[in-house]
């Protein structure tokens, strides 16, 4: 590589195979690569069952793995402690949202407020030209001079949904080295290089809820017995009682404790009245939704956008019309009714492979 193309790049290292391979590839391309892991949560109070290990990211074990990989490929490595900021910007929001009767997505908030804000700022302090991550997403610069965010080439691993908040300034300083690869290719590259994390499992759970028991976590944060109340139908008929609105999310069927001739699902959560609203499956259907905090990777042309949207990560994109409002909100109409529109989740707008933008679901239409 010619010297003029050599860049200083900070790579966010989680200790997993993806960011490890991304770091190795950037080093092999001749760049000056600096590995950084974020310490965001104290795992001292969590112990995995004997012989088992939590499938999460950002633990001390993961940081140790990242450090060893950095040593193996020959790059400097640092740990930045963002525990206080992560608590304030991600965890407190997660807890507050559940107690408002909403179902949050902390991974999007972490990307928005920590990784591509605080860590990107740290990269700039180190004089880096770019921050690279192991996300399966693509970034291209169009003929219009603007940066465009695209799905990762591997549809099974695409993580563009979690990145919809990225701005032009952030994209200009971000690299996704794995965007054109499949997971199988990444593991093969790791094995070929003898990286110790080549066969390491993938993180599955929320990093600060490693046992996936979010109810336990919320009750440790706020106490037990809070937000208890009635289970009602759409007409207000009382069908039972519940131990806390935060225990329920739209679409949930299990754990209602109600004997009823037809299957009932959670169709709404009214935290103010401490009510969990249930109904048959057809009451889960919505013709659209309202969204707040709507942001656009590339500014839309006009007040109406024809797109497809995902209302949760594993949701298949569906055709929709987005009515853009001046106050940063939007009204989204589906072409066909969709199930389980969940307040607090992210709605992300696509056109083919391109991420147009997204926002946070406020309510259903």
Swiss-Prot record:
This is tRNA-specific 2-thiouridylase MnmA. PANTHER family: MITOCHONDRIAL TRNA-SPECIFIC 2-THIOURIDYLASE 1, TRNA 5-METHYLAMINOMETHYL-2-THIOURIDYLATE -METHYLTRANSFERASE. NCBIfam families: PRK00143.1, trmU. It comes from Geobacter sulfurreducens (strain ATCC 51573 / DSM 12127 / PCA). Its EC number is 2.8.1.13. One of its GO terms (cellular component) is cytoplasm. It catalyses: S-sulfanyl-L-cysteinyl-[protein] + uridine(34) in tRNA + AH2 + ATP = 2-thiouridine(34) in tRNA + L-cysteinyl-[protein] + A + AMP + diphosphate + H(+). Its main location: cytoplasm. The keyword tRNA-binding applies. It is an enzyme of class 2 (transferase).
